[in-house]
């Protein structure tokens, strides 16, 4: 067998039907679109319209709601505060507040609207005695700060 002797099986490769190429082709004149009307024109597809039956979007029930009292937190890790202390961007003598964290660039708090929560992910040791005034703390973060001799205001 040679490469020039290879061929497709019979019926494996079929030419597609060319529509709207004369009445003798079997799909001529209107090209399978019917006569007149919106759907016979080019470029028309009515999104969500299912031919008069109730659309899927109306058949499915409404679900859930957006709670207006949900609190949105900016998350900060103890590791990031410790790194800022080492870099000299924060001072251990000062009380660390939301405004101070924004000023240093540890959090992005537009219009001072969001609350700040301190977490202790990947931090098992924390040695700096800090005084912090933030909105929320994880239980592990509280324990680490108190163990280091810090204060939560």
Swiss-Prot record:
- A Pfam family found in this protein is Ribosomal_L27A
Keyword Cell membrane attributed: no
Q: What InterPro entries does the database record attribute to this sequence?
A: Ribosomal_uL15 (IPR030878), Ribosomal_uL15/eL18 (IPR021131), Ribosomal_uL15/eL18_sf (IPR036227), Ribosomal_uL15_bac-type (IPR005749)
What organism does the UniProt record list as the source?
Rickettsia akari (strain Hartford)
Q: Name one GO cellular component term.
A: large ribosomal subunit
Protein's recorded name: Large ribosomal subunit protein uL15
* Gene Ontology MF terms: rRNA binding; structural constituent of ribosome
Q: What is the lineage of its organism?
A: Bacteria, Pseudomonadati, Pseudomonadota, Alphaproteobacteria, Rickettsiales
GO biological process terms held by the UniProt record: translation
Q: Does the keyword Metal-binding apply?
A: no
Q: What does this protein's UniProt record list under function?
A: Binds to the 23S rRNA.
Q: Where is the composition biased (Gly residues)?
A: 23-35
Tell me the keywords, alphabetical order: Ribonucleoprotein, Ribosomal protein, RNA-binding, rRNA-binding
Tell me its family.
Belongs to the universal ribosomal protein uL15 family.
Q: How is the quaternary structure described?
A: Part of the 50S ribosomal subunit.
Positions of region (Disordered): 21-40
Q: Which domain of life is it from?
A: Bacteria
């Amino acid at each position: 067998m040679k490469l020039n002797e290879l061929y497709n099986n019979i019926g494996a490769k079929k030419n597609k039907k060319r529509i709207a190429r004369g009445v003798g082709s079997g799909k001529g004149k209107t090209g399978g679109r019917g006569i007149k009307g919106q759907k016979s024109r080019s470029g028309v597809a009515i999104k969500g319209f299912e031919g008069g039956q109730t659309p899927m979007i109306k058949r499915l029930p409404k679900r859930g709601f957006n709670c207006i009292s949900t609190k949105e937190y900016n998350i900060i890790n103890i590791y990031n505060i410790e790194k800022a202390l080492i870099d000299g961007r924060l001072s251990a003598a000062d009380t660390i507040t939301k405004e101070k964290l924004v000023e240093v660039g540890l959090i992005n708090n537009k219009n001072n609207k969001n609350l700040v929560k301190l977490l202790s992910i990947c931090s098992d040791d924390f040695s700096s005695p800090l005084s912090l005034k933030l909105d929320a703390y994880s239980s592990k973060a509280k324990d680490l700060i108190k163990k280091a001799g810090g204060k939560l205001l």
